């Protein structure tokens, strides 16, 4: 039977019962009295308030313990009556208060018992109990026989502390005592209740918060058989003593004590055996183990607050704040700020060289490609069809696949897909990224998409991969994805701020390194040269040298070339701005080979150059003067002879002691040039401003005659009319001496400058200095131009081409000279009997040249044509591929060589040209037809016409088709059925390719 204890009853109900019985004897019991009354009415009243509740112990099989908030004891009244010598105690239970009933089998009369006690002392003399003790003892034995089954179930008292429910018989059965009164019931139950006196609990029900049930699984009451005179007082022993042991204990908030305590389990017999001891009282049970254990709690004190309060809150003893900041996935600055947080960095991972932060809350990840923080981006990951977020496992798996294949995807997108998509969209190519990429694990495909429409972005709809997407290559991510690794931030750089950089400032005057630059040339120069006539800005690394000299206006010789078009000669800021290659030229005085600039040997603006002595043909890198040195000397000279702002005089150079050719020649031969001084015939006298050029560093100044202002005798070239397309300049005479004055049968400095200007316009095409990728490969170098001008007075036309031209005789105004032609010599009449793949094929050697062709054949298209940034430069490679892949009859004979697409793609990567984007695999519609074009002796001009047609056709294919026809074999372009003889020579191949591509354009476009 379950005993319940509660401290929450506002009231305890009153139970009233009446009995009728025969009259009997009367007697006394200690200080209490027992009386027997016929037809007496016994009223049991238990008053309980919020501060007091009823506590009772019943000997008929149940024990009820109630702890109250007050030390006062309730009043219990018990009246007994009986007419039979044999009585049976029965238990009748109600929900609130139940009275014990004794029924006589002889008279079928019943009596109810109740007890009251107001004293802590329970008398131990039970001998005076009534004469019917024998019968009483029998009944008591019957009652006592159940004592072994009585369990206090003390755990219920501690477990959850449910409300106190007095559902047991509070009153003991005292059979046969007719005269006993309520005083006789001052035994065990009352003693147990009285034992609570003095105990104080502020809120004992709180103790149930964390306590497991206290289970007393032993017999609380021992069998006391044979004690005829024992009454209910005999039950006032162990339980009362155990309860009394709690006296004096004080708990301000008992639930605190339960916070960390394990359940108290009293599995021992609380009460000792008191067999046969009629006079034993509750004192005999005061030495039990359970009582001792309970007594040990006396004096304990617990505070009201939980012991672990504030552990997870802020404070010196709390845990650190591990929360992550928020970020805006659309703002790169916000992403960098977020990733710089130490808690975020500790959660970042590395995969395939990329830094990753996986945000499981958003089903996204932040990617830092290849550790480049400038390219940080946030990528949302969802189900491609349902558009739902992924769980953590799938998110990590797909993130690993994306990182593993990102490098492969980037290369495929940048080189192949993006140019095609940009061309279709009509936007500039470069820098465009797909909006969405779907990685399909089922079909093992990866498709990139542009912006989705509302239907495609809706749930339950997968965008078409073939109509709307573009397949991209992610590599072998479906076989094996790379694992995530932790990042060692001790060796990896984190996101840097915009103001990143350490500044070192010298705070001590006079200390530290000297301000003058080191005389040692820099190994990696960066030169930006802006040449204006009379005022040139030379930017060498971080050193700017500006010189603009102004002289009084003087009368000078009228030049034949207008200077209005000789402004703003600008070479870009590259180390190879004037880096040209001329392996075939061995003429004297030229600056040949690869010209690599180095910084000036001194930081002053004297214009001096430092170089060891070498012969006139010494090239840079072999103890020869650097092009920077030559330009510096030229600049100093021009500042003198063309004084004033923005190029100075428009009437030609002022007479000086030397010419521009002398300056260049001296620098090339001796490593330095003498000072340029205006000649005395200007009328300005010795006070005219002059410019001095020192020989070497700190070398002595060289002063020459002011009357020497002629052009050096090594200035030569053919003469031409002023301003014509040949780049030549008029000269009065083809014969000149070094000391010939300007305007006196020699080319003027303006003529030389005009020729230089025209050359630079070709090798640096475009506005304001043109190409930023360095000079284009041409048929001659800048040194050749100056040498020819100094030698013959004219120079040949500069042609951007990978080959050199031939020499021929050209007449000038004052005679004739040997110069190079404008274009390469026309090829001999093509022969239909000469195999175009043979060594004697003139067209092949002409188009490719020996070294370039050999390089392309050896490397499979890896040979680079320097400066070949236009589509025309792709034709030699295509030609070389045709020579290798097709025989004389036009049949495909070699499949081992690289595809045409790979050659074109490599060309694009090298030159930055969009060119043809990929090889052709299949084309819609008819492939077109071709007709054989036979070449005759009069078809020389068709070579360039065919090349121009092929160029235009290829450009149209690149712009319109743009990979819509991917992967078609080259044989299908030049041969419809694989039979026939096509492409016998250059004319046939060019014409047929042009016609086929035109047919494709008509079919597709």
UniProtKB/Swiss-Prot annotation:
Superkingdom assignment: Bacteria
Role of this protein: Appears to initiate or participate in signaling events that regulate the actin recruitment, which ultimately leads to internalization.
Pfam families according to UniProt: DUF1547
Compositional bias (Polar residues): 1-10, 130-154
Chain positions covered by the region annotation Disordered: 1-36, 73-155, 487-521, 542-626, 671-749, 792-847
Predominant cellular place of this UniProt entry's protein: secreted
Organism: Chlamydia trachomatis serovar D (strain ATCC VR-885 / DSM 19411 / UW-3/Cx)
Upper classification of the organism: Bacteria, Pseudomonadati, Chlamydiota, Chlamydiia, Chlamydiales
Gene Ontology molecular function: any one: SH2 domain binding
InterPro entries referenced in this protein's UniProt entry, alphabetically: Chlamydial_TARP, DUF1547
Name of the molecule in the record: Translocated actin-recruiting phosphoprotein
Cellular component terms per the entry's GO annotation: extracellular region
The record's account of how the chain is modified after translation: Phosphorylated on a tyrosine on attachment to the host cell. Tyrosine phosphorylation is temporally and spatially associated with recruitment of actin to the site of chlamydial entry. Phosphorylated Tarp seems to remain cytoplasmically exposed on the inclusion membrane at one side of internalized elementary bodies for several hours after entry.
Keywords: Phosphoprotein, Secreted, Virulence
Keyword Magnesium: no
Ranges annotated as biased composition (Low complexity): 11-36, 73-121, 542-578, 593-612, 720-736, 831-846
Signal peptide residues on this chain, from the entry's feature table: none
Cellular compartments annotated: Secreted
Assigned protein family: Belongs to the chlamydial CPn_0572/CT_456/TC_0741 family.
């Amino acid at each position: 039977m379950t005993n319940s204890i509660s401290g929450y009853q506002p009231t305890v109900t009153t139970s009233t019962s009446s009995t009728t019985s025969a009259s009997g004897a009367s007697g006394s019991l200690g200080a209490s009295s027992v009386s027997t009354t016929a037809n007496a009415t016994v009223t049991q009243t238990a008053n309980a308030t919020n501060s007091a509740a009823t506590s009772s112990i019943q000997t008929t099989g149940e024990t009820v313990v109630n702890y109250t908030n007050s030390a006062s004891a309730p009043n219990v009244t018990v009246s007994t009556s009986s007419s039979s010598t044999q009585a049976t105690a029965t238990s009748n239970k109600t929900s609130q208060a139940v009275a014990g009933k004794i029924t006589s089998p002889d008279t079928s009369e019943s009596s109810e018992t109740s007890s009251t006690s107001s004293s802590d002392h329970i008398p131990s003399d039970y001998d005076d109990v009534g004469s019917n003790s024998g019968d009483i003892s029998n009944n008591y034995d019957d009652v006592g026989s159940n004592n072994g089954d009585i369990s206090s179930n003390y755990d219920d008292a501690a477990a959850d502390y449910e409300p106190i429910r007095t559902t047991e018989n509070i009153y003991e059965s005292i059979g046969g005592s007719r005269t006993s009164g309520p005083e006789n019931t001052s035994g065990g139950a009352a003693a147990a209740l009285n034992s609570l006196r003095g105990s104080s609990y502020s809120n004992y029900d709180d103790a149930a918060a964390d306590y497991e049930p206290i289970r007393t699984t032993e017999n609380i009451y021992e069998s006391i058989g044979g004690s005829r005179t024992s009454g209910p007082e005999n039950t006032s022993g162990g339980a009362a003593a155990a309860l009394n042991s709690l006296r004096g204990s004080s708990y301000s908030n008992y639930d605190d004590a339960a916070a960390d305590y394990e359940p108290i389990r009293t599995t021992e017999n609380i009460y000792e055996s008191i067999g046969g001891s009629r006079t034993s009282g509750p004192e005999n049970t005061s030495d039990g183990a359970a009582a001792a254990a309970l007594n040990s709690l006396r004096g304990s004190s617990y505070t009201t607050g939980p012991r672990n309060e504030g552990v997870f809150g802020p404070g010196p003893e709390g845990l650190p704040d591990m929360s992550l900041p928020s970020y805006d996935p659309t703002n790169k600055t916000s992403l960098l700020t977020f990733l710089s947080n130490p808690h975020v960095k500790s959660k970042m991972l590395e995969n395939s060289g990329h830094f990753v932060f996986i945000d499981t809350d958003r089903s996204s990840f932040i990617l830092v490609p290849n550790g480049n923080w400038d390219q940080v981006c946030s990528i949302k990951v969802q189900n491609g069809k349902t558009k739902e977020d992924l769980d953590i496992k799938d998110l990590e798996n797909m993130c690993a696949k994306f990182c593993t294949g990102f490098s492969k995807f980037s290369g495929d997108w940048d080189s192949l897909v993006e140019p095609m998509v940009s061309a279709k969209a009509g936007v500039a190519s470069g820098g465009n990224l797909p909006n969405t990429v779907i990685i399909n694990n089922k079909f093992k495909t990866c498709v990139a998409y542009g912006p989705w429409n509302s239907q495609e972005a809706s749930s339950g709809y997968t965008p078409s991969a073939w109509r709307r997407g573009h397949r991209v290559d992610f590599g072998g991510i479906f076989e094996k994805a790379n694992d995530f690794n932790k990042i060692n931030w001790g060796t990896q750089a984190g996101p840097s701020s915009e103001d990143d950089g350490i500044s070192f400032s010298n705070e001590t005057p006079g200390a530290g390194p000297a301000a003058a630059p080191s005389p040692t040339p820099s190994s990696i120069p960066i030169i930006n040269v802006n040449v204006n006539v009379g005022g040139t800005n030379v930017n060498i690394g971080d050193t700017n040298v500006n010189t603009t000299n102004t002289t009084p206006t003087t009368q000078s010789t009228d030049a034949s070339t207008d200077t209005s078009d000789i402004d703003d000669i600008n070479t870009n800021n590259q180390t190879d701005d004037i880096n040209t290659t001329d392996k075939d030229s061995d003429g004297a005085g030229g600056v040949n080979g690869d010209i690599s600039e180095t910084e000036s040997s001194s930081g002053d603006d004297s214009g001096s150059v430092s170089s060891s002595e070498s012969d006139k043909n010494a090239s840079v890198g072999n103890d020869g003067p650097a092009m920077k040195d030559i330009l510096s000397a030229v600049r100093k000279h021009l500042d003198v002879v063309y004084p004033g702002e923005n190029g100075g005089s428009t009437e030609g150079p002022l007479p000086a002691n030397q010419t521009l050719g002398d300056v260049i020649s001296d620098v090339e031969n001796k490593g330095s040039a003498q000072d340029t001084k205006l000649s005395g015939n200007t009328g300005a006298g010795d006070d005219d401003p002059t410019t001095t050029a020192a020989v070497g560093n700190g070398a002595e100044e060289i002063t020459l005659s002011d009357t020497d202002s002629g052009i050096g005798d090594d200035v030569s070239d053919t003469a031409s009319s002023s301003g014509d397309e040949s780049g030549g300049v008029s000269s009065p005479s083809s014969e000149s001496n070094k000391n010939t004055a300007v305007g006196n049968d020699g080319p003027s400095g303006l003529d030389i400058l005009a020729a230089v200007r025209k050359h630079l316009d070709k090798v640096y095409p475009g506005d304001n200095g043109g190409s930023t990728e360095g000079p284009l490969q041409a048929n001659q170098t800048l040194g050749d131009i100056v040498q020819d001008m100094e030698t013959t007075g004219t120079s040949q036309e500069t042609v951007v081409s990978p080959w050199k031209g031939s020499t021929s005789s050209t007449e000038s105004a004052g005679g004739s000279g040997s110069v190079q032609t404008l274009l390469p010599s026309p090829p001999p009449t093509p022969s239909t009997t000469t195999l175009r793949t043979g060594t004697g094929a003139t067209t092949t050697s002409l188009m490719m040249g020996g070294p370039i062709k050999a390089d392309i054949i050896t490397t499979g298209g890896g040979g680079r044509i320097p400066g070949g940034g236009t589509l025309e430069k792709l034709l030699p490679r295509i030609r070389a591929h045709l020579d290798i892949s097709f025989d004389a009859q036009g049949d495909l004979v070699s499949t081992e060589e690289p595809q045409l697409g790979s050659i074109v793609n490599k060309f694009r990567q090298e030159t930055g040209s969009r060119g043809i984007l990929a090889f052709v695999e299949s084309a819609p519609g008819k492939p077109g037809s071709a007709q054989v074009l036979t070449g005759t002796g009069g078809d020389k001009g068709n070579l360039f016409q065919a090349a121009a047609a092929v160029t235009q056709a290829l450009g149209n294919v690149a712009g319109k088709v743009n990979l819509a026809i991917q992967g078609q074999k080259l044989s299908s372009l030049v041969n419809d059925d694989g039979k026939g003889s096509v492409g016998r020579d250059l004319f046939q191949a060019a014409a047929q390719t042009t016609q086929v591509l035109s047919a494709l354009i008509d079919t597709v476009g």
